[in-house]
Amino acid sequence: MKIGKKCLFSSDVIIRTSDAHSILNGEGKRINKGCNVTIGDHTWICNGARVMKGTTIGSNCVIGSNTMIAGINTGDNVLVVVNPARVVKTDINWSNIRIIE
């Protein structure tokens, strides 16, 4: 697992690099091997999000609340939400400083 600099993780986030159990084929060989997870710099993983094996999240991204993201590469500067996870906005930025207008 690789996590970039200045990331923000809300509560109840789960990051998994494996299924935590084995699934075997008819010959007794494991078919669900673990895979790396990579999270870029300045990425915000919101409350209840699940980041599963084989996922690469780019830099400056937001993964929405309760989103399950599995085995995809998001690219940079995107908002990813819903299940199954999909990019819904591109060319985004975020700040942990509250802006009052």
Annotated model-derived regions:
Residues 77-79:
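Extracellular disulfide-bonded cysteine-rich modules/repeats
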Residues 1-56, 67, 72-74, 83-84, ...:
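Flexible, glycine/small-residue-enriched loop-and-beta-strand segment within the central core
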Residues 96-101:
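Charged, low-complexity C-terminal accessory regions
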